């Protein structure tokens, strides 16, 4: 990834950064909740974004 990024790439990276976080604590505490963790977590070294 070059140090000079285009704005489009930067926006995509920012979105992926936001997606790559654990689910909020209060969502797990809700009644009838079956979601235990974020199944779509991505590790920076294991899985690359592909752009």
From Swiss-Prot:
Annotated InterPro entries: Ribosomal_eL39, Ribosomal_eL39_CS, Ribosomal_eL39_dom_sf
Q: Name one GO biological process term.
A: translation
Q: Which range is the signal sequence, renumbered to this chain?
A: none
Q: What keywords are assigned to this protein?
A: Ribonucleoprotein, Ribosomal protein
Q: Which residue ranges run through the membrane?
A: none
**Alphabetized Pfam families for the sequence:** Ribosomal_L39
Q: Which GO terms describe its molecular function?
A: structural constituent of ribosome
Tell me which GO cellular component terms the UniProt record holds: cytosolic large ribosomal subunit
Which branch of life, at top level?
Eukaryota
Similarity remark: Belongs to the eukaryotic ribosomal protein eL39 family.
Q: What is this protein called?
A: Large ribosomal subunit protein eL39x
Species assigned in the record:
Oryza sativa subsp. japonica (Rice)
